[in-house]
Curated annotation (Swiss-Prot):
<keyword id="KW-1133">Transmembrane helix</keyword>
<keyword id="KW-0812">Transmembrane</keyword>
<keyword id="KW-0808">Transferase</keyword>
<dbReference type="GO" id="GO:0015020">
    <property type="term" value="F:glucuronosyltransferase activity"/>
</dbReference>
<comment type="function">
    <text>UDP-glucuronosyltransferase (UGT) that catalyzes phase II biotransformation reactions in which lipophilic substrates are conjugated with glucuronic acid to increase the metabolite's water solubility, thereby facilitating excretion into either the urine or bile. Essential for the elimination and detoxification of drugs, xenobiotics and endogenous compounds. Catalyzes the glucuronidation of endogenous estrogen hormone epiestradiol. Involved in the glucuronidation of F2-isoprostane (5-epi-5-F2t-IsoP). Involved in the glucuronidation of the phytochemical ferulic acid at the carboxylic acid group.</text>
</comment>
<dbReference type="InterPro" id="IPR035595">
    <property type="entry name" value="UDP_glycos_trans_CS"/>
</dbReference>
<dbReference type="Pfam" id="PF00201">
    <property type="entry name" value="UDPGT"/>
</dbReference>
<keyword id="KW-0325">Glycoprotein</keyword>
<keyword id="KW-0256">Endoplasmic reticulum</keyword>
<feature type="glycosylation site" description="N-linked (GlcNAc...) asparagine">
    <location>
        <position position="431"/>
    </location>
</feature>
<dbReference type="GO" id="GO:0008210">
    <property type="term" value="P:estrogen metabolic process"/>
</dbReference>
<keyword id="KW-0472">Membrane</keyword>
<feature type="glycosylation site" description="N-linked (GlcNAc...) asparagine">
    <location>
        <position position="293"/>
    </location>
</feature>
<feature type="transmembrane region" description="Helical">
    <location>
        <begin position="489"/>
        <end position="509"/>
    </location>
</feature>
<dbReference type="GO" id="GO:0005789">
    <property type="term" value="C:endoplasmic reticulum membrane"/>
</dbReference>
<dbReference type="InterPro" id="IPR050271">
    <property type="entry name" value="UDP-glycosyltransferase"/>
</dbReference>
<dbReference type="InterPro" id="IPR002213">
    <property type="entry name" value="UDP_glucos_trans"/>
</dbReference>
Length: 531
């Protein structure tokens, strides 16, 4: 018998609530991208799993991060390359960045020696669909949606093959496919193209280059993705373009926001979730707490070029080590390469460091970063001014945006000297404006109605519940290029105007002939008679 203050109906209510929660749980298919792309995507997947959803992650058997023990169902498929092949191709890609930095937008990638790395990634999709047992399993499982990283295109192909609504999770989209597939207006007059390192306030010369890059992307980007599109066409048994693959996307979750990004128009199905990787700082381990405490009044500098850069050319590493030895701060440098012979006593090499936790410590004075989106947002969230050494991809643009906002200094990692790095560090540490600017950005970023992680989870669940989001799809998808720009209407109106002008002209000409042409003939006739 229940106590007097315990309603007999309460257990029933609890059961109904639990049942309703389970009834709303769905099945989600996840097609991720390896490397740092997976780190943040994994947090979204884990929260969805925690909320009761059934999650299946499809990954290649050869990868860096994807085959590590996970809390959800993982389905692997065999690939045609080994771990050594993957490491070798990626090393070629990284080595190329240490020889010459990416300039001129996306077009130089077409002939880059590092293109083999991308071709290897694109080949994963053929391997996935060659696994007939896995394909049959996916076909028999009633998924509600696909959660995907579009970098290697395979997730888009999977969504189209199984006719499932999809949610894209990415920092940004190469080429013009975001504006074409999501129909986001992207005027080249003030929206800089990716990899050009321009701001939204461009000179005439920059606007000219920006327009040429915009036109070049439309002319040549399909070549970069040719093998991916060919594989998709082979799988789907019909010719498809990259736009065909991107267009059905229900929701675009982009890891940026208007604290980092320049203001621009977006469509209602494009959701900004910048800072999703930022978390509340945890207490430091005894090892790192000891490093921080030993730094004294000068504090520490955190240095990391990301999880994908394991080694730096020896000469460049020694230049960096020399510069770090000239500042009074203790430097915690995440580095797994060969130890520079001139490493100073104030510089501590570690194979791993709790980056977000260190950046959140009050004794952190500066952050040396490669400007990847994860590091940039951790710097923003924790209010730490940055010295940025971008290497490839969106890192160039991220660095330019932070520099424009007065929150950091950008260095060309290939051309910089020890003096350049020393001066940059002293500038962001000693010039109070950098700290003030990054704190202002941090305040703006945190002033939001909902956390980015919760927002991302909401929209994934939204697509799962409603089997897509067709009501957010703009009608621009159904227009031809000349209808979109109203060229047919302009032509029609122009034809009317020209017709009216022509008629008026003819009427005037006729009137003139009637009024003046007859008199002229009469006078002429009169003169001839007098002779």
């Amino acid at each position: 018998m229940a106590p007097a203050d315990f309603p007999a109906s309460l257990p029933l209510c609890v059961c109904l609530l639990l049942a309703s929660g389970l009834a709303q749980a769905g099945r989600l298919l996840v097609v991720p991208m390896d490397g740092s792309h997976w780190f943040t995507m994994q947090t979204v997947v884990e929260k969805l799993l925690h909320k009761g959803h059934e999650v299946v992650v499809v990954v290649p058997e050869v990868s860096w991060q994807l085959t590590k023990p996970l809390n959800f169902v993982v389905k692997t498929y065999a690939v045609s390359h080994t771990q050594e092949d993957l490491n070798r191709e990626f090393k070629i890609f990284i080595d190329a960045q240490w020889k010459s930095q990416q300039e001129g937008g996306i077009l130089p990638l077409l002939d880059s020696p590092a293109k083999g790395f991308f071709e290897l990634l694109f080949s994963h999709c053929r391997s996935l669909f060659n696994d007939k047992k896995l394909v049959e399993y996916l076909k028999q499982t009633s998924f509600d949606a696909v959660f995907l990283d579009p970098f290697d295109v395979c997730g888009l192909t999977v969504a189209k093959y199984f006719s499932l609504p999809s949610v894209v999770f990415s920092r940004g989209i190469f080429c013009h496919y975001l504006e074409d597939a999501a129909q986001c207006p992207s005027p080249p007059s003030y929206i800089p193209r990716m990899l050009l390192k321009f701001t939204d306030t461009m000179t005439f010369k920059e606007r000219t280059r920006n327009l040429l890059a915009y036109m070049g992307e439309r002319a040549f980007c399909h070549k970069f993705f040719k093998s991916a599109a060919d594989i998709a066409s082979e799988v789907l048994q019909t010719p498809v373009t990259m736009t065909d693959l991107f267009s059905p996307v229900s929701i675009w979750l982009l890891r940026t926001d208007f604290v980092l990004e320049f203001p621009r128009p977006v469509m209602p199905n494009v959701i900004y979730i910048g800072g999703i990787n930022c978390h509340q700082g945890k207490p430091l381990s005894k090892e790192f707490e000891a490093y921080v405490n030993a730094s004294g009044e000068h504090g520490i500098v955190v240095f990391s070029l990301g999880s994908m850069v394991s080694e730096i050319p020896e000469k460049k590493a020694m230049e960096i080590a020399e510069a770090l030895g000239r500042i009074p701060q203790t430097v915690l440098w995440r580095y797994t390469g060969t130890r520079p012979s001139n490493l100073a006593k104030n510089t501590i090499l570690v194979k791993w460091l709790p980056q977000n936790d260190l950046l959140g410590h009050p004794k952190t004075r500066a952050f040396i970063t490669h400007s990847g989106s994860h590091g940039i947002y951790e710097g923003i969230c924790n209010g730490v001014p940055m010295v940025m050494m971008p290497l490839f991809g969106d890192q160039m643009d991220n660095a330019k945006r932070m520099e424009t906002r007065g929150a950091g200094v950008t260095l060309n990692v290939l051309e910089m000297t020890a003096d350049d790095l020393e001066n940059a560090l002293k500038t962001v540490i000693n010039n109070k404006s950098y700290k003030e600017n990054i704190m202002r950005l941090s305040s703006l970023h945190k002033d939001r109605p909902i956390e980015p992680l919760d927002l991302a989870v909401f929209w994934v669940e939204y697509v799962m519940r409603h089997k897509g989001a067709p009501h957010l799809r703009p009608a621009a998808h159904d227009l031809t290029w000349y209808q979109y720009h109203s060229l047919d209407v302009i032509g029609f109106l122009l034809a009317i105007v020209l017709t009216v002008v022509f008629i008026v002209f003819k009427c005037c000409a006729y009137g003139c002939r009637k009024c003046f042409g007859g008199k002229g003939r009469v006078k002429k006739s009169h003169k001839s008679k007098t002779h």
